[in-house]
From Swiss-Prot:
It comes from Microcystis aeruginosa (strain NIES-843 / IAM M-2473). Belongs to the NrdR family. Its cofactor is Zn(2+). This is Transcriptional repressor NrdR. Residues 49-139 form the ATP-cone domain. Residues 7-18 have a biased composition (Basic and acidic residues). A zinc finger (unnamed) spans 3-34. HAMAP family: NrdR. GO terms for molecular function: ATP binding; DNA binding; zinc ion binding. Negatively regulates transcription of bacterial ribonucleotide reductase nrd genes and operons by binding to NrdR-boxes. Keywords: ATP-binding, DNA-binding, Metal-binding, Nucleotide-binding, Repressor, Transcription, Transcription regulation, Zinc, Zinc-finger. GO terms for biological process: negative regulation of DNA-templated transcription. NCBIfam families: transcriptional regulator NrdR.
Amino acid sequence: MQCPHCQHTDSRVLESRSSENGQSIRRRRECLQCKYRFTTYERIEFVPITVIKKDGKRESFDRCKLLRGIVRACEKTGIPPSRLEAIVNDIESRLQQDSKREVTSQEIGQLVLEYLRQESEVAYVRFASVYGNFQGIRDFIAALALLQSSEIERAHPSWSQVEEASVITSS
């Protein structure tokens, strides 16, 4: 680290501690040449994620916008705000861990639906209706049928194996 006083490039760390709720590390340093003491901060640098909208426009990932959409879908469902915040944290973390720097709004919508399916059927259908741009009752019925079939699959995973076996034997 370069000394701000004499520009010498060697320094030693006297003290390190976590700061800003664990989001950075504060280091107290001393220049090896002039003995000047100074403080540096080390922070995580997140690579920005670009969201490709349905119309092809590109915009920066907006965590607040995602949270607003999820909160809206979960109104009056009893899901605590801390859980909604955790869902957004998980989604953002998954996006940051992916090597892609561009993601479609459809991919983000699918991630949200994965989480909401586990939390609340009502929130799932509400979010799906906006995300899927539902036009009428048939769209709602299709979403409910999909939700119901996945519930049956989760409750009775062997049923799909029985169905597969009957299809295989009837061929």
